[in-house]
Amino acid sequence: MKKKLKIGMIIAYVVLILYAVVSLFPFLWSAIVSLTPMRYTENCVTTGTDIMKWPPEINLFKWPPEFFGAPATGENYVQVFKITPYARWILNTIIYAALVTIGHLIFDALGGYAFARLRFPLRDLWFALFLATLMIPGHVTLIPNYNLMVRFGFVNTYYGLFLPKLTGVFGIFLMRQFFMGIPREMEEAARIDGASIIKTYFKVVLPISKPAISALAIYIFVGTWNDFLWPLLMTSRKEMFTLTVGLDFYRTSYYTYWQYMMAASIMMTIPMIIIFLIFQRQFIDTGVSSGVKG
């Protein structure tokens, strides 16, 4: 029995290691390409999947990779800031992600508390219908939302980016589940002491809900930081691009500046890695606990 268990553990570890290698290889490839001097691939032209290359340049897409022989340089990272308004794109992305996250924390918590504690006609039916909207693909609402933003004149503005994203069904569901797990006696004690429902919400419920709020904030911020489709629709001026949209700036009809694109991608990814490493415990613990309560 112990021998079978040991073999099973070995197989499991091998599978996990292989999965980790496969998952990390694209990031490793991006990091190496971002450090490869531009002169080593400046004659490498990409058109779709076809690659035309003149020696002695390095082919970034050859297997096994041959770019390990190129001397590493940080020049590509410097050039990203010189040839594009990358600093402005960082600012745009931070503003976009921060405003959307703040909106979700406010409205999702209020909506979740309403469904968890307030009594109103057909509350459970409304909540079921509300959850049913999760089955509607997000792409279905893209055109209506875009038309509304165009009518309001919010294209190429921060308003157009964050207003349609200020709340979401998943966030309300997450907060509602967490609120359902809070003992009612705590709120009733506050009400007996003379606290209004609003004061009870802010002084009792929200402080207890910091783990769920933290998890929701991380989830929304990371998702918004990596959002591509909506910023692509709402921004046409280079100065209003977010980081995800700006990556396409390094590609033309005949040439892709892979070193610059990968350098920009690495700089875009690093903040998210740091956030996950710092808050991974709260994120995982809260994701498990709040998802099963109520």
Task: Tell me what each language-model feature is.
Residues 2-4, 8-294:
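A structural signal for multi-pass alpha-helical bundles of membrane permease subunits
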